[in-house]
Structures are given as C-alpha cells and as structure tokens.
Amino acid sequence: MNDDDFGFSGIIKIANVSDFIAPSQACILPLQSKESDVEVQIRVRSRAKKVDDSAVKKVEVTLKDCLACSGCITSAETILIKEQSKPKFLEGLKKAQLSVMTVSPQSIASIAYKRGCHLSEAARLIARIFMNMGMKYVVDSSFGRLLTLSLSYDEFKESQLQRPIFTGVCPGFVCYAEKTHGTLLIPHISCVRSPQAMMGALVKDYLARKFNVRPEEIFHASVMPCFDKKLEAARSHSENHFNCREVDCVLSTGEVDAILDECSSTESFPVDGKVGWLNALENGKIISSEGGSSGGYAEYIVKRFVEESKTPLKLKRTIKDKNWEIIEAVDGETIVLSVAKCYGFRNIQNQVQKLKRSKCNYDYVEIMACPSGCINGGGQIRSASIEERKQLLDTIELPCSEDNSEMEEQLERVKEEWSILNPDWMNLLYTKYHAVVKSDADRISTNW
C-alpha cells in the first residue's frame, strides 16, 4: 500500500524525515514492560533454541498512541484502516441504538460532480442510501460550522490569544503545529472546535440528552474530504467529556462513493413537517457557505467586523492565487483589520518563518494544509489525470447564495435547549493544544 492510496495532507507527509513509517517497520514508541529484580546470567550457546512464535503476544500500536508519540507527524495508514474503515462503520451501525451520520458539503460536491448531478440530488442520494442502511439521521456538517463561525468571532473579539489568530479546524495543521512548532504556534491557534467536533458534541451530548440515550449507545459517523479528519476523531480530547468518542468513525468521500456504487435506492422519505437541521439533507437542502470552499472563516470574521464597525469601512482584496488571499478592512488609506486565507504547506511554512521574525502582520488567518483548501482534500474522489483534477477544482462549487437565516434561527433554539439540558454545554465547544516533546531519538532523526 503506497502513499497515493491514502490522501493525507502534504504537510503531514513531508514535515519530518521520520514521518509516515508503519509502526511494524520503525516505530520509536517504547514498549511497556514490568521491572524485575531478578538477576540474569548470560552465557554463550553454540545453537540458539527455537522460539515458539505462537506464544508471543502481538504488539499493537493504536492511533491514539501514534498521536501522542513524537516520532512521526501522524500515524500510519495501517492503523487508520483498522480503526476508521467500512467494516468498522458497519459494525458500529449494527450495534447502535441511535445512529447519526454527519456529511461535509465538500464531500457532497465531489460526489455530485462525479455523478453529474446537482448538489441537492447528491445530498438526497447520500441520505437515502445510508438511511436505508439503518442511519436515523444524515445531517450537514455545516450546521456545526455555523456554531464554529459564531464562536470564532466571539473569540477573536474577546480572547487574549496572540495575533495573528490561526484557525484550528484543520487537523493536518494542528498536528504539524503541536509536533514541530508547539511553543511558537500553539499560542496563536483558535481554541474553537471544528465543525466535525461540534457535530460530535451535538450528537453525543445534545441529542443524547434530548432523546434520553447514553452517548456510548449512539453511533456517530462522519463523511469528510480529508483523511486527516480521522486523526481529529482519534484525538484524546474527543473523549474528555464522554466514555466514548464523539465521532466513532470517519469515512472519506472516496470510501462513501464506493459504498454508493454498491447500493441503489429509489425510496424517498416524506417530509415530516418543517425542514430542519436533522432532515435537511434528505430533502436536498444544503447550508450555504460564503467565502470559499474551506468554511469561509476569514470572510466571516472580516465581514462581521465591518458590519459591527461604528465607522464605515471598505473591503480591499489581494488575490495572489487559489492558495493565498488577503482581505483588508480599510478606512481611507488606513488598514483597520487584515485577514488572510492560507492554503498548502508552502504558504504555511512562509507564515511560520514570518512569525519567527515577527513579520506576520495579519489579525486572523484561515489556514488549511491542503492546496486549494478543503475541496481538494486527500479523501476526495480522484480524477485520472492532473488536467482533469485541475478542471474538477475549477468546476466544483458549494452553495453560497442561499439565505442561512432559517438554520441560524434553529441553531439559536438548539443552543437555548442545550443550555437547559446541560448547563456546562459550552465547555464541549472548545479545545486545548499541547506541544509534543520530542525524544532524543527523534531529535537525531530530525537533524539527520
């Protein structure tokens, strides 16, 4: 199995020379053994006794072990296959009392492009297939994104985070920051959780309390454009408030597309009253995204800042390419606020170097590990050639013109009810980051 089979972000695969090595080959994680006071005598034998392989217990390194280890930037593909795969998905779906699937709009867009259908048709297809398989709800991850955007702006205005503030929604960037530039980058990373994590909290806490179901009896799967989201779901903070993960299984767009190819469904589900966040996708409604295909975080921050400003401000855009854009709120010739969209490892490295020299002068940076952002995630459906892939990126679009006011009103009602069900609900919406201390072995390999 080679790297091309699993599309981790480039920032994860090339940031460390010891990266992307299967644990069975060269894992530096020390194996635990009990200490003993028994003295051992060593003597030379002419012939070694044959070891009984059947009596030796197999050593297993879990995904969580890899994330806690300083030897690699990320875990091995074999571990991800074992813990985040179709068999794991089917197993969890079969055992659950309540099952929910969260689907990203980028995944819907990729599937729609491949099948030559409208986004709403693709949304209905995905919902029908998985509801036929046993899913109770198939929901749009953008409902969680609305919460992430709102809290990100509150944090931007009120927090004491060092400027610039970097978004913390890309697990590839977060993993890179913690393991290579922890002291430098962590004080700048937003503590607001990603849309996938927000949906995890909604499902495992809000819905669990609302429907009187224990969190461990709920199976929550997600469909994401990025394999790095499998890493995010395995992070230990997703289990801090529960006895189980908030997201039990993450499937890539390509993995879900393969499932769709194996299934067929002509059954339609009738609309039960008003379309809401729990049944929007099955009715072909996708929450729109203004400001690009990666969540629109920079756009949201600067536009809301302008709306709330007591002084009339204008927006000035500088677009260098698809991976680098600067948006400034200006009052005449004065720059009042400066935000940026930064995609791809090369641009991230440039910002790290500027930060080291205290020359990163932006207030807020929407930062993603993948070139072209989330729409180009490694888990998306791949084209046969580079030319087709470029055409795909130019063609795939997310809904951006529809009014989200109805969904935003629903979110406010959910927040109000959630606060009654769990007075500490806000604690579930933020996270913390930890710099991983490198071992001596890793320092040697890094400086090799």
UniProtKB/Swiss-Prot annotation:
Disulfide bonds: none annotated. Coiled coil: none annotated. GO terms for biological process: iron-sulfur cluster assembly. [4Fe-4S] cluster 2 binds at residues 170, 226, 370, 374. InterPro entries: Cytosolic_Fe-S_CAF, Fe_hydrogenase, Fe_hydrogenase_lsu_C. [4Fe-4S] cluster 1 binds at residues 27, 66, 69, 72. Keywords: 4Fe-4S, Iron, Iron-sulfur, Metal-binding. GO terms for molecular function: 4 iron, 4 sulfur cluster binding; metal ion binding. Component of the cytosolic iron-sulfur (Fe/S) protein assembly machinery. Required for maturation of extramitochondrial Fe/S proteins. Belongs to the NARF family. This is Probable cytosolic Fe-S cluster assembly factor Bm6838. It comes from Brugia malayi. The lineage of its organism: Eukaryota, Metazoa, Ecdysozoa, Nematoda, Chromadorea.
